[in-house]
């Protein structure tokens, strides 16, 4: 018996839509990363992108436990000397709520070209509307 290896051209990708309202950030992100990698499929192959497309709605309503709403910090650097910037979870949700979920999921994906290809299949929206109706996404309950 031979080991099965998925071919990139034969992988069937589905579209799913997830509502993030009231979901805990980390628990949601782990399931999204798992599905973006394709680990839920029988034909999962580590070196091939076998994951599905995922649309996340209501990113502004994602929940965190404990004091993370005030205490969790996000950092980025502008590239200039002394250009480190920081923002709390509350500030990130107010300014760009999509980035909170994107950052959490991106950290759970592989680093390198394969991980970037997986990350591109994640579509996050702050509100309840998305422009992927033509793909006929299925509702995914996480």
Curated annotation (Swiss-Prot):
GO annotation, biological process: negative regulation of translation; translation
Entry keyword set: Ribonucleoprotein, Ribosomal protein
Gene3D superfamilies: Ribosomal protein L13 (3.90.1180.10)
SUPFAM superfamilies: Ribosomal protein L13 (SSF52161)
Pfam families associated with the record: Ribosomal_L13
GO cellular-component term (any): cytosolic large ribosomal subunit
PROSITE patterns hit by this protein: RIBOSOMAL_L13
GO molecular function annotations of the record: mRNA binding; structural constituent of ribosome
Subunit structure: Part of the 50S ribosomal subunit.
Family: Belongs to the universal ribosomal protein uL13 family.
Function: This protein is one of the early assembly proteins of the 50S ribosomal subunit, although it is not seen to bind rRNA by itself. It is important during the early stages of 50S assembly.
Protein name (record): Large ribosomal subunit protein uL13
Organism: Klebsiella pneumoniae subsp. pneumoniae (strain ATCC 700721 / MGH 78578)
UniProt lineage: Bacteria, Pseudomonadati, Pseudomonadota, Gammaproteobacteria, Enterobacterales
């Amino acid at each position: 018996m031979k080991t099965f290896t998925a071919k990139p051209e034969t992988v069937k990708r589905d579209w799913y839509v997830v509502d993030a309202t009231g979901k805990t950030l980390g628990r949601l992100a782990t399931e999204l990363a798992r599905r973006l990698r394709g680990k839920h499929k029988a034909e999962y192959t580590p070196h091939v992108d076998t994951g599905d497309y995922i649309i996340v709605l209501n990113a502004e309503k994602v929940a965190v436990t404990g004091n993370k709403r005030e205490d969790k910090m996000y950092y980025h650097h502008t590239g200039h000397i002394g250009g480190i910037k920081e923002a709390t979870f509350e500030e990130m949700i107010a300014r760009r709520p999509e980035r909170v979920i994107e950052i959490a999921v991106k950290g759970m994906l592989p680093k390198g070209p394969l991980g970037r290809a997986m990350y591109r299949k994640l579509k996050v929206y702050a509100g309840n509307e998305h422009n992927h109706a033509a793909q006929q996404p299925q509702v995914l309950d996480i």
